[in-house]
Amino acid sequence: MIDIQLYKQSIDATSVEDSVYDDTCGGIVSFVGTVRNITKGKKVLRLEFEAYQSMALKEMRKIALSATTKWPIKKLAIHHRTGSIPIGGIAVLISVSSQHRADAFEACRFCIDTLKTTVPIWKKEIFEDGETWVSAHP
């Protein structure tokens, strides 16, 4: 099972993690990317994400399929949020289940690392004194 989603509403971490549960698996690993309140000494008010939706979903699915060929994954979910996200809000959640924890850890790391470099999602940091685009993927 592969579950790929990109949406504006809040990510429900418990629901996503529950969706990858499988009683044949001994490990579930999740990465939860949250909005922090400071970057390089500057106070962050919020983040804003924009995406080329159809391409982002396609690239996220490619990442998931690649992970399932590299590791024996039972279930995998990649959810990313767009729009304005407050401090403490979840921007991205990746959850992986596998029979063994090492495979789940490696697959989860691969997914977030690849997502950050290949998926067309752009992040803008909003500070007290201005804003800046901090990443632009191909």
Question: Would you name each region that the model predicts?
Answer:
Residues 1-90, 99-109, 113-138:
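N-terminal, polar/charged subdomain of small-to-medium soluble alpha/beta proteins
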Residues 95-97:
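Short hydrophobic/aromatic beta-strand micro-patches
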